[in-house]
């Protein structure tokens, strides 16, 4: 047994068979008598020494077990079931090939043509192709299986198994030439490529306005790395973006592209993993977990739309893909490139402090203009008697676009028909019995649903408390779709949210329909806000710019600015100028005004001053300890215990500030109450071990046996 292989071991007093991975081998042990390994499951290591080091780094950085870290790295199909079989097997195809020379096969075929014409036909086909899949060979010749078996027995052909890969659907065509770079792009490429070729680890930030052509710079950088025999990982924030990226990069790099994301089948993920590990695929494109791809000779990692919170995992291991990428680049001696039109505040701060190299694309490619943005005050719309969610200005612009044959995208960050249903008489509101949130109404099936736990129920005809009339409050994607169809009954509207893209590949199919059929209007959630490139889209409408602005997070302003800037940037990406309408109840809000001007520099200056006053990142680091359980009092007590212990430890040096316990914004989810303790400090690396120890204490303390406790480094919320 060697490090990196999986084994079965007898676990606990009952010697329950458990699967594990060997991390290291030693001649001695501090534990005295040890149990023997039951079985070694791999003939060669699944994990390289570099991956084992990464797992150990993740244990310390992200408060997880090594096993959790390893499971995040490996595709699900590699793990064994209770009978000792892997959950997904290698896919093979039966092949047929000649065992004799083509000349001898031809002579035998000529001799057999009258008495065994099928055998003759099989041999003649194989003389032309040498080897073929048995199924195709029989299909093309019309021969029977018995004829093929007879040739095997005669020693003229042999059957063997050949491994084949289950591949995600990609549209491979002719390889396209490299895109032509403008002066600004060329300057950025030259500088970044020099860093990538230096053989030293480092990080760079490519800050470019929407439509500036960051992808073209990526393509040139990847070309250079592949030419050197190096591998590249490209991360995208959303599965919805992956098909477009695959199409773009496959047109330049062909079959060397591998795809890794959660919408693939288990078999596809397993086979793509093997293609990367074997070196058959050297450009990996995927979402957050693709950062673990076993790419050999890593030359570059690119994180596109690096500010997106989807790069942070909310389940164990609670890693940030950017942190993992920084570690991998440091170990491999290569460059990490962060790209965005609205960089994370911390990333831009590091770039301005000189920790990252900064490259800027200030203009759109081919001198296209940024969209013209107009803010609409929805309070004024209400005073004018317009009680719908679509302002008069947006309606007029949509009408103009439809008449010109141009397309429009409308964004609202809430799926369903209505945010909530309430009684106009007594004020009763439908709430989830398992979570501390209101139920969202879905008109398609006339059900009220909880978007946290999945609970649903039918909508009553009248208030269940007093029998009064029910009011529909707050619009979602379904309601906007309905309003659009009422305004434009002869116009097709396509909706894009998690309710319409449940099946694998369904988002890709919707995007293709929108692009190819020139459907006039698309309405959707965050899936439509970033990375998409539709040349005929000349109008973007933001239904409610206020939704994310007043969330209880110090990042609320940053997320709102990024969201608005990104969605506005979907307009005018072709030869026609773009427009955008932002609807809001707070038109004087500074963040909304900055987003309407697409002025990141101004937003950064005001936001960094606020962060400095608040002492929030990048001016401090942040850890949280979260407890959850069915008994709210026990959950609070567990957090109180952590807070008291930290106060005793930190109180001696004042190196950090401890806040809480406090309930999360949604305190109850699926009948479990959630409280947390927040720790701020200039440098918290010394506290991580202490916090980890406190989490273990809580998990083993009988007083908190019904409470789950975990720590998180730099949480998203």
Where do the PLM segments sit?
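Short helix-capping segments at alpha-helix termini
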Residues: 253, 488, 649-654, 701-703
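Short beta-strand elements
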Residues: 649-664, 705-713
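Hydrophobic, Leu/Ile/Phe/Ala-enriched alpha-helical segments that form helix-helix packing faces
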Residues: 484, 567-571, 646-650, 694-702
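Accessory, non-ATPase domains that flank or precede helicase/AAA+ motor cores in DNA-metabolism machines
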Residues: 1-340, 352-368, 678-680, 685-692, ...
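C-terminal effector/interaction modules appended to NTPase cores
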Residues: 670-672
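Inter-lobe coupling/hinge segments of SF2-like helicase ATPases
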Residues: 175-182, 186, 190, 200-636, ...
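Accessory RNA-recognition modules of RNA-modification enzymes
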Residues: 130, 667-668
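Extracytoplasmic/periplasmic
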Residues: 633-648
């Amino acid at each position: 047994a060697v490090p990196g292989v999986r084994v079965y071991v007898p676990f606990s007093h009952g010697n329950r068979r458990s699967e594990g991975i060997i991390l290291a081998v030693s001649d001695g042990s501090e534990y005295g008598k040890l149990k023997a390994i039951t079985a070694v499951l791999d003939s060669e290591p699944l994990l390289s020494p570099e991956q084992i080091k990464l797992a150990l780094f993740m244990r310390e950085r992200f408060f997880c077990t090594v096993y959790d870290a390893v499971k995040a790295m490996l595709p699900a199909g590699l793990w064994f079931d209770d009978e000792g079989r892997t959950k997904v097997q290698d896919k093979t195809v039966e092949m047929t090939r000649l065992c004799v020379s083509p000349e001898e096969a031809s002579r035998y075929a000529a001799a057999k043509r009258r008495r065994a014409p099928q055998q003759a036909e099989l041999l003649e086909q194989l003389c032309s192709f040498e080897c073929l899949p048995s199924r195709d060979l029989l299909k093309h010749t019309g021969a029977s299986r018995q004829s093929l078996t007879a040739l095997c027995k005669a020693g003229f052909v042999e059957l063997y198994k050949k491994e084949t890969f289950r591949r995600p659907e990609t549209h491979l065509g002719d390889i396209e030439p490299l895109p032509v770079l403008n002066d600004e792009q060329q300057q950025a490429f030259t500088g970044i490529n020099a860093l990538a070729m230096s053989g030293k680890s480092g990080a760079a930030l490519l800050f470019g306005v929407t439509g500036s052509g960051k992808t073209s710079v990526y393509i040139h950088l990847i070309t250079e790395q592949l030419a050197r025999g190096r591998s590249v990982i490209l991360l995208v924030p959303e599965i919805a973006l992956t098909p477009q990226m695959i199409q773009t990069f496959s047109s330049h790099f062909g079959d060397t592209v591998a795809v890794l994301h959660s919408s693939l089948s288990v078999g596809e993920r397993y086979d793509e993993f093997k293609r990367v590990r074997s070196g058959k695929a050297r450009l990996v494109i995927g979402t957050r977990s693709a950062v673990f791809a076993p790419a050999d000779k890593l030359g570059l990692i690119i994180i596109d739309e690096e500010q997106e919170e989807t790069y942070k995992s909310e389940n164990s291991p609670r890693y940030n893909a950017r942190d993992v990428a920084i570690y991998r680049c440091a170990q491999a001696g290569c460059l990490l490139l962060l790209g965005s039109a609205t960089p994370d505040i911390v990333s831009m701060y590091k770039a301005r402090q000189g920790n990252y190299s900064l490259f800027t694309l200030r203009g759109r490619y081919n001198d296209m203009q940024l969209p013209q943005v107009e803010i609409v005050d929805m309070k004024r719309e209400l005073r004018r008697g317009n009680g719908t969610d679509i302002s008069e200005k947006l309606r007029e612009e949509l009408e103009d676009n439809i008449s010109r044959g141009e397309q429009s995208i409308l964004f609202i960050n809430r799926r369903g028909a209505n945010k909530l249903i309430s009684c106009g008489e007594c004020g009763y509101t439908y709430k989830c019995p398992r979570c501390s949130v209101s139920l969202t109404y879905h008109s398609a099936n006339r059900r009220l649903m909880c978007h946290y736990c999945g609970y649903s129920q039918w909508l009553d005809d009248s208030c269940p408390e007093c029998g009064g009339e029910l009011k529909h409050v707050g619009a979602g994607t379904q309601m906007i779709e309905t309003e659009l169809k009422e305004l434009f009954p002869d116009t097709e509207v396509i909706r894009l949210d998690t309710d319409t893209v449940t099946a694998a590949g369904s988002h890709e199919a919707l995007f293709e329909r929108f692009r190819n059929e020139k459907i006039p209007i698309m309405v959707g959630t965050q899936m439509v806000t970033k990375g998409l490139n539709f040349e005929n889209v000349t109008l973007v409408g933001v239904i409610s710019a206020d939704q994310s602005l007043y969330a209880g997070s110090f990042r609320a302003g940053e997320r709102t600015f990024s969201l608005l800037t990104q969605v506005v940037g979907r307009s005018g990406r072709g030869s026609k100028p773009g427009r955008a309408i932002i609807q809001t109840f707070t038109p004087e809000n500074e963040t909304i005004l900055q987003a309407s001007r697409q002025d990141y520099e101004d937003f950064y200056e005001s936001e960094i001053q606020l962060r400095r006053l608040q002492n929030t990142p990048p001016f401090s680091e942040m850890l949280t300890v979260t407890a959850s359980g069915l008994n709210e009092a026990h959950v609070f007590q567990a957090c109180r215990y952590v807070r008291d212990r930290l106060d005793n430890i930190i109180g001696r040096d004042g190196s950090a500030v401890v806040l809480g316990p406090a309930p999360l914004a949604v305190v109850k989810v699926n009948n479990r109450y959630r409280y947390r303790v927040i720790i701020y400090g200039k440098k918290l690396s010394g506290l991580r071990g202490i916090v980890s120890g406190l989490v273990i204490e809580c998990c083993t303390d009988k007083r908190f046996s019904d409470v789950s406790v975990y720590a998180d480094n730099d949480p998203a919320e």
